[in-house]
Amino acid sequence: TVPETYMVRQVIKETGVVFQLGHQGRQTDCYQKAEEIIGNGLLGPVNLIEVCTNRNSPNGAWVYDIIEGSNPNTIDWKQFEGDPERIKEYMDYMTSNKLERYIGPDERSKFSLERFFRWRCWWDYSTGLSGDLLTHEYDAVNQIMHVGIPHSATSSGGVYFFKDGRTVPDVLQTTFEWPDRDLTMLYSATLASSRNRGKVFMGHDASMEVSNIL
């Protein structure tokens, strides 16, 4: 959650511990080549970027296997739920931002094998497609074009395929705008299709599709 990020930062400042957080694909040579191509003006002005992360498998949709024999005696549910103070901060944040419909308070405190093994499916513990997959695509674009923080971002989507009680969307579309750079980026994802459209940079003179390999 957002409050937790500030808590982590505060602990790092107070303790002086070394903390490293990264994205997937930082070692990818093709991003450096794509940056070079755009920097040399081969595409002309780039006004539209499209990225996606489609998946089409239970594991890709976070429906992980439940280990046989798992029960309240073999799982520390209180540890999984976390510190009461952290839970209170989370609840306060969700309430103040009028996100109560995503909390599911009755279910959160009830022992659940699905929630323990498939925690990514609930806002209570996860950031869903945006924080799990979109973040890597955004970082890739930022490596290539140094877009920084957008002027605005809007999202839409829902739970349209996996009707398993999850609260995070299995379909998501997000639009980022940089008016000062005359640039828009579109992100879309579905967990019910394996059609991968790659990363497409659309310029006035040419377009370029970027994969993870040269």
Predicted regions, residues:
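Pocket-flanking alpha-helical
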Residues: 5-11, 29-38, 57-63
